[in-house]
Amino acid sequence: MFIISSKNMLQKAQHAGYAVPAFNIHNLETLQVVVETAAEMRSPLIVAGTPGTFSYAGMGNIVAIAGDLAREYNLPLAIHLDHHESLADIESKVMAGIRSVMIDGSHFPFEENVALVKSVVDFCHRYDTSVEAELGRLGGIEDDLVVDSKDALYTNPQQAREFVARTGIDSLAVAIGTAHCMYAAEPKLDFERLAEIRALVDIPLVLHGASGLPESDIRQAISLGVCKVNVATELKIAFSDALKEYFLQNPKANDPRHYMQPAKQAMKEVVRKVIHVCGCEGQL
């Protein structure tokens, strides 16, 4: 099997003290970049897609192409449902072959979040599918969900322990000051809070909103228990900026096989950097 659960992948990372990158993809080219680069660096890989991504590119297309690339490069990988909110949607995608899920009920009150997440865990674990959930809320934009910075909430460590115990999730996404965007100013992450969560929760922790974070912050978060690092915005910016520059230099260009190459290369450099910072090169 080349499409796998992320559970063992993250447990191995937790034991060895590195993190696995989860790269959000959107189309054929971005999927090619993350798989090819991870294979070159012999890095474990999580390919992430929001509901909008699966709607745009097609669920079957993503699974089929990712599976073909994984076999071509001999690289087992997890296709991960990022920020999914519907049990029915998750059920249909798990039945189509997905084995890694994030159910996001962080916008609900605590008890509703617990109930939703528990229902997803009960279903997914029957199919050897790992489940990530979020407690607390990140600011920024993810698909069509916009969370103003004033509405962002940090994860409560004591509540995190209860949340993990009651839901049975495999990994916990924590809110410690990151956001789903590039940062206008350097963010101040609450590492003390992260350390408190780590002391109370023994499952892998997940850092969302890593685009644009200082490398030192990512490394410190990993040292405090983060085992999965999500990167999306930084990839899109690198890809689109390279496309724009290509057309500025070549205004009459019209062949995707040509203009996609610099965009893929720019994104590849970001992927290489993140793998290096996560410390997962050669960890297959």
Swiss-Prot record:
Catalytic activity: D-tagatofuranose 1,6-bisphosphate = D-glyceraldehyde 3-phosphate + dihydroxyacetone phosphate
SUPFAM superfamilies: Aldolase
NCBIfam families per UniProt: cbbA, PRK09195.1, PRK12737.1, tag_bisphos_ald
Function: Catalytic subunit of the tagatose-1,6-bisphosphate aldolase GatYZ, which catalyzes the reversible aldol condensation of dihydroxyacetone phosphate (DHAP or glycerone-phosphate) with glyceraldehyde 3-phosphate (G3P) to produce tagatose 1,6-bisphosphate (TBP). Requires GatZ subunit for full activity and stability. Is involved in the catabolism of galactitol.
Gene3D superfamilies given in the database record: Aldolase class I
Pathway in which this enzyme or protein is active: Carbohydrate metabolism; D-tagatose 6-phosphate degradation; D-glyceraldehyde 3-phosphate and glycerone phosphate from D-tagatose 6-phosphate: step 2/2
GO process terms (BP): D-tagatose 6-phosphate catabolic process; galactitol catabolic process
Annotated cofactor note: Binds 1 zinc ion per subunit.
UniProt source species: Salmonella paratyphi A (strain AKU_12601)
PROSITE patterns noted in UniProt: ALDOLASE_CLASS_II_1, ALDOLASE_CLASS_II_2
One of the record's GO molecular function terms: zinc ion binding
Record keywords, A-Z: Galactitol metabolism, Lyase, Metal-binding, Zinc
Listed name of the protein: D-tagatose-1,6-bisphosphate aldolase subunit GatY
Gene: gatY
Residue sites binding dihydroxyacetone phosphate per the record: C181, G209, A210, S211, N230, V231, A232, T233
Entry GO terms, CC: cytosol
Family, as annotated: Belongs to the class II fructose-bisphosphate aldolase family. TagBP aldolase GatY subfamily.
Ligand binding (Zn(2+)): H83, H180, H208
Any single Pfam family the record assigns to this protein: F_bP_aldolase
Taxonomic lineage: Bacteria, Pseudomonadati, Pseudomonadota, Gammaproteobacteria, Enterobacterales
Residues at the active site: D82 (proton donor)
Cofactor: Zn(2+)
Leading EC class: lyase
Self-association and partners: Forms a complex with GatZ.
Enzyme Commission number(s) of this protein: 4.1.2.40
